[in-house]
């Protein structure tokens, strides 16, 4: 919904379609909203729980983990690593939506009814390679020892490259590639089907206000 809402305010080309830049900006807006409101708190909690199960066993449940983290470290802990998450998610949404909206019209004559599946899968592949470094930095920053080892997201990225080479930033690409290509195919197919059946997601463009006549 954020993407469609933001796209209402984006410029159109001569055919009445949102421009490439418009799709990119709308995608980034969707990514920022998703990152700040949902992903960063959720990813911090998930990473803490995974690390805890492999180590000290400080948390009895998700609810207990939330209470303990807020009491001990403050609510701001849930937004630790918000910069790399936002960079990753805004870029991810920008690449995913822009790629899909560029690929779908090109593939339509060849793929027909399968266009959304193929375009969604390809958009997922492109997204993985463009955003994997942000994902690896985010994961390292949100680990239990992240705040002790790394002073910033940039410091984390530098240490990953120094210790493992540039390829370290793309570690774990293959499993994520499989996951996002399948997820992209399913998500965009469902999205297009919902739009086709209901039409409620396609919001009208905001018309420009005509200037008032001079008195």
UniProtKB/Swiss-Prot annotation:
Solcar repeats lie at residues 18-106, 111-197. The keyword Lipid metabolism does not apply. Its main location: mitochondrion. The chain crosses the membrane at residues 19-39, 112-132, 182-202. It holds the Pfam family Mito_carr. InterPro entries: Mitochondrial_sb/sol_carrier, Mt_carrier_dom_sf, TXTP-like. Pathway: Mycotoxin biosynthesis. GO terms for molecular function: citrate secondary active transmembrane transporter activity. The keyword Thylakoid does not apply. Keywords: Membrane, Mitochondrion, Mitochondrion inner membrane, Repeat, Transmembrane, Transmembrane helix, Transport. SUPFAM superfamilies: Mitochondrial carrier. It is a multi-pass membrane protein. GO terms for cellular component: mitochondrial inner membrane. GO terms for biological process: mitochondrial citrate transmembrane transport. It is found in: Mitochondrion inner membrane. Belongs to the mitochondrial carrier (TC 2.A.29) family. Gene clusters encoding host-selective toxins (HSTs) are localized on conditionally dispensable chromosomes (CDCs), also called supernumerary chromosomes, where they are present in multiple copies. The CDCs are not essential for saprophytic growth but controls host-selective pathogenicity. Tricarboxylate transporter; part of the gene cluster that mediates the biosynthesis of the host-selective toxins (HSTs) AAL-toxins, sphinganine-analog mycotoxins responsible for Alternaria stem canker on tomato by the tomato pathotype. ALT1 also selectively transfers methyl groups at the first and the third cycle of chain elongation for AAL toxin. This is Tricarboxylate transporter ALT9.
